[in-house]
Amino acid sequence: VRDLTGDDGLYWTPATEGERQTIEIWLPAGVSAGPVRIDAPRLSHLMANAVDDFRILKNLGASASCNVNAICRIDELGRGYTTAKNAVARMTFVKDAGTYLCTGTLLNDTDTTTQIPWFHTAHHCISSGQVAATLNTYWNYESSSCSPDTLGQYVQLSGGADFLYSSQDTDGALLRLRDGAPAGAAFAGWDANALSPATDVYAIHHPAGDLKKVSSGQHVVAR
């Protein structure tokens, strides 16, 4: 349920399975439904295939072999890794003539009295308010076992995000989710200081829209 209070009155629905989607409109008591008009200026029909059992939200096993299920590294990397893992979400959004997949991270700030859902992603994913408004995020979209891939319970948030900033040079973008983060999500800490050469680094992401994965390497100074 969402109040359409935006100036443009637009609302992007969550992605749903099947060929039909039902939309219910709730009006205040005493308000006639006669003048209400609904338009669908854009539709995104996500194609599925037999490999994914014709389910649009799977994409299981689509990533490269250097990525392992995020749950596999919990014992090795500990609590800090688990917190960072729980801050990462799968993304779908509409841009130009298609729907795309990316990864984003929920960020913390220094105000301990609030939990503002700052959301960091890539500039090449979202670089305008028009695209940010179409954002859906998928939380805890990961395997419940190390092997085989087994999609557990996840939460989908719709309603989009407010676009705050992006930079093509750094390929970064900052958004603010219009819905609060779901239960179980974490707010990731961050540090703007440069990494030392050969520092171990870990990428927690949804490559090719796959389940949450982690890959590892070392920081290399560009020359």
Name the predicted role of every residue range.
Residues 15-223:
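Serine endopeptidase catalytic core focused on the charge-relay Asp
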